[in-house]
């Protein structure tokens, strides 16, 4: 669809021909405010709009009123919640893991004729609501008066003012942002939007592993995890619904719904968020330094655990080693030629059939898996194994998985969107919303960990079967959250068996920082691939993550994906880049061992 450059269509996702049964409801001036259990509850009426480029109230429809809740925490954190009669505020979420520093601070409200002042009990201002209409010097009736609005200012740390975008319009009917609104389709609430004011010189960072310039201002992102298929495009493996602002605040949108985030892109005056869920749960975090703000975010969603010491050594891999003899030959040569190496990774080739993940070694090429692993351990190597969270149609476990609903039953056939380099038909996605499926998956990994495997590569997880019946939630909500549930399961069983908490993961969402570590996906072995990886890693680190790596010297080659030769300079410079990342792993579609680059090794 061609852009219209109008907010209603390009950001709020209404069809330009307005052929669908959809409606937009804009927040108006609050009608009342009260205290409840230390929170401030604000009754906000919403007026249905006549849909067009020029918005106007649809006075034939009665207003609908819903409660906006303000909650204050220590660490300079203010929370806004509105469920539009569909959802209730909760701290019971996979994404949330409050630290001991997060304490609720009771709020109180003082009402005057023109404003409602919200403070903590120590008298520090935390929010202000203007309820008096703006002063006018009326001389013209050419245009209608502006509609009522929600004029709310937040002061999370008692100092910095973060305003909702109450008046982002050209003429009164021509809006470029709305402070608060929801949308209905076929009479059902299904989307919600919230906007903050943005300043002309404001800069932004974060939002996950964003392969973009360091200042994200002027850009709009669709927060939907998908196979990035490289690091030089708008797709990304790791969306995080959190951004940092140069005005020394950050915002965490507590949702796993597909969302849209515009950082002064749709309108240069507003940061806008649109969720494909009729709920908004927003934490605004302010501080004197970026470190304070990131700490506040981690106070809400969890801190990265420390990976084991051995993981900070050098990992060697390629796609892929195919036999115990090949691996032993490479490991022996690494030692003989004095190349440091601590972990050897086996990618897709350790199964009976390449890419056919059955969580079992090929009996011919790896006749004694446990002895093979223990032998490598004696040489100073730990073993990492590749796998993925899907069960193929011809996998050994398919009947068991289907019979017990360990994979979500499909409602119809769909093609894979990810980088499936095999001809396999992935028949289903392991349903981590179902505890029995999670335990089944853990048992599959435990068999490998009991042999001496020390790390599981939790590849993929960005895409799931969307036309499937998951036990715990709709696929539209599970899509982004899946990475967290998947990595949590692998991390927990690895720590239970080996004592070391670690995974090697590609996808991510809010909370995944608790289960390190992550790597940057399938970058090109080129200068622009290295630059894209670096940009992604920097934004990822500014999204609450501490441990991150990337394939040295890039994953694939060009023009031939598998077979082009990696430039010596790229290999050398990418190695240096890897040394100064938290973790370094050589990996890619062809040879990565240093003796294949004699001019520099």
Spans of features found by a protein language model:
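Catalytic and substrate-binding clefts that recognize carbohydrates or anionic sugar/phosphate headgroups
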Residues: 2-24, 46-51, 59-72, 80-308, ...
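Aromatic- and carboxylate-enriched substrate-binding clefts and catalytic-loop regions
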Residues: 3, 83-85, 145, 157, ...
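Non-catalytic, glycine-rich low-complexity segments
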Residues: 15-40
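Extracellular/luminal recognition modules and glycoprotein regions
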Residues: 30, 38-54
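Short secondary-structure junctions
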Residues: 32, 105-110, 408-410
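A conserved hydrophobic secondary-structure block that centers on an alpha-helix together
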Residues: 228-233, 317-367
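Conserved, well-structured core segments
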Residues: 314
């Amino acid at each position: 669809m061609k852009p219209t450059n109008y907010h209603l269509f390009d950001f709020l996702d209404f069809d330009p021909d307005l052929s669908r049964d959809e409606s937009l409801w804009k927040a108006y001036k609050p009608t009342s405010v009260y205290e409840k259990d230390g929170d401030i509850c604000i009754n906000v009426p919403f007026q249905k709009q006549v849909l067009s480029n020029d918005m106007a109230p649809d006075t034939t429809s009665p207003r609908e009123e819903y409660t906006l809740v303000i909650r204050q925490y220590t660490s300079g954190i203010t929370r806004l919640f509105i469920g539009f009669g569909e959802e209730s505020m909760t701290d019971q979420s996979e994404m949330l893991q409050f630290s001991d520093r997060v304490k609720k601070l009771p709020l109180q409200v003082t009402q005057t004729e023109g404003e409602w002042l919200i403070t903590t009990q120590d008298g520090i201002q935390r929010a202000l609501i203007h309820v008096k209409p703006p002063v006018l010097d009326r001389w013209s009736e050419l245009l209608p008066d502006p509609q009522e609005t929600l004029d709310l200012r937040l002061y999370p740390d008692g100092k910095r003012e973060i305003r909702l975008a109450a008046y982002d319009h050209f003429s009164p009917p021509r809006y470029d942002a709305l402070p608060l609104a929801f949308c209905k389709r076929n009479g059902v609430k299904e989307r919600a939007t919230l906007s903050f004011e943005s300043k002309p010189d404001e800069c932004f960072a974060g939002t996950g592993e964003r392969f973009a310039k360091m200042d994200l201002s002027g850009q709009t992102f669709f927060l939907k995890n998908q196979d990035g298929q490289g690091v030089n495009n708008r797709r990304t493996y790791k969306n995080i619904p959190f951004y940092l602002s140069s005005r020394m605040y950050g915002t965490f949108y507590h949702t796993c719904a597909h969302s849209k985030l515009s950082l002064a892109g749709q309108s240069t005056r507003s940061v806008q968020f649109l969720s494909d869920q009729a709920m908004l749960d927003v934490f605004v975090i302010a501080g004197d330094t970026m470190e304070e703000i990131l700490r506040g975010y981690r106070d809400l969603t969890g801190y990265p655990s420390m990976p084991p010491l051995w993981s900070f050594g050098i990992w060697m891999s390629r796609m892929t080693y195919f036999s115990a003899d090949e691996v032993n030959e490479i490991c022996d040569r690494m030692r003989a030629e004095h190349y440091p190496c601590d972990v050897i990774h086996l990618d897709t080739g350790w199964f009976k059939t390449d890419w056919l993940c059955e969580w079992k070694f090929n009996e011919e090429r790896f006749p004694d898996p446990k002895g093979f692993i223990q032998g490598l351990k004696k040489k100073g190597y730990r073993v990492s194994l590749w796998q993925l969270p899907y069960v193929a149609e011809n996998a050994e476990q398919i009947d068991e998985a289907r019979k017990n609903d360990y994979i979500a039953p499909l409602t119809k056939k769909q093609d894979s969107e990810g980088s499936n380099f095999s001809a396999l038909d992935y028949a289903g996605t392991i349903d981590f919303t179902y505890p029995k499926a999670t335990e089944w998956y853990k048992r599959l990994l435990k068999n490998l960990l009991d042999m001496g495997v020390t790390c599981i590569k939790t590849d993929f997880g960005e895409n799931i079967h969307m036309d499937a019946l998951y036990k715990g939630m709709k696929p539209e909500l599970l899509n982004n959250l899946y990475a967290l549930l998947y990595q949590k399961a692998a991390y927990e069983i690895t720590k239970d068996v080996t004592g070391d908490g670690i995974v090697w993961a590609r996808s991510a969402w809010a909370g995944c920082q608790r289960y390190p570590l992550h790597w940057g996906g399938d970058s090109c072995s080129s200068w622009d691939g290295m630059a894209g990886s670096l940009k992604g890693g920097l934004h990822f680190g500014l999204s609450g993550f501490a441990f991150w790596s990337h394939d040295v010297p890039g994953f694939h080659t060009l023009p031939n994906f598998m077979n082009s030769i990696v430039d010596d300079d790229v290999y050398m410079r990418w190695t240096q880049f890897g040394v100064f990342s938290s973790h370094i792993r050589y990996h890619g579609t062809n040879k990565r061992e240093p003796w294949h680059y004699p001019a520099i090794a």
